[in-house]
Amino acid sequence: MDADTDTGTDAGRETRLPLGPSIAAAAVSAAVLLPVMWLIRTGFGVGFSSAVTLLTRPTTLEVFVNSALLVALTTAACVAIGVPLAYLTVRTDLPFRRFWTIAVSLPLVIPSYVGAFAFVSAFGPQGGFQRLLAPLGVERLPEIYGLEGTVLILTLYTYPYVYITARASLKSMDTTLIDAARTLEHDRWETFRRVTVPQIRPAVAAGALLSALYVLADFGTPSIMRYDVFTRVIFVEFGTFGRDTAVLLSLQLVAVTVFILWLEARIRGEERTTAGGRSRALVKLGRWRYPAVIPVAAVAGLALVVPVAILLSWLGASSGASQPLSVQWSYAFNSVTVSAAAAAVAVVAGIPVAYLSARYGGRLPGVF
């Protein structure tokens, strides 16, 4: 074995880091840390007493609590929706499984802020749904703004992160373990809890992490739903020259993000891989086969039908206006160009980091 491949191992993984990927990963890490270092440097300039005063203000504490509640509730809702949907579309004889597999993944193509605009237009004050119910004497609908509405919107457009990762894990899982559990007279719920959940837990944790980070970083949806979270308040403070408050809130946001990453790693634990024959026998839903379609259709319909219907109504209204709607091709070109460039950079930057983390043991790859 030559010198380049003669490496130590740690629990089956090599421990001697290759020079090229290490330099690339270090460069990526440095680029990511530059904004954080600027925040820390600027935060030190605020002064200890001023920082304590700003961070302990009731409004600052309210923003922290609002953000924590939004992330916790939305992530929990995404798991509660995504995992059952994945199980139904992979492991059961749900009718039209292929159709529902696509339908419940489609909310990813709708930006959450577009969904927020659509829901406010439909269910907000004097919205389309309220006008529809006005002849029946309904003068006001429950308030859609605030925490509840924001959780609803973000859940509808981020649960696919959990669904897709859980579905991939369920499809690759060795179901002979489930068959073995059933032969030991475990019922379906106990089999799911003791066999299925431990195997899909890393995938579910990864999907929940994506949902949580999306919620934490989202600016458009909380702004439309009039709910003060880190991103919205930081933007307002920077715009009004409240740089000290914005910097301290940004540092809080970074700290919360690090905590979420740590928590995900603890929940995920060590990833499990199974080998052997795979049984593709589906779970028979029996008399619940067709009723099980109702919650699946409700989730997909709420996330897709409402925004599409509102957008079509706007399009129809614009066709009769004096200045009909025209397609802004320059905006579309800019969006596609920026998205493609960002995706390419993300892939190039992510490969060395992912390679080192997955291939080599030790703490340093984990730091990258």
At which residue positions do the language-model features occur?
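Glycine/proline-centered hinge or cleavage motifs at structural transition points of membrane proteins
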Residues: 184-185, 198
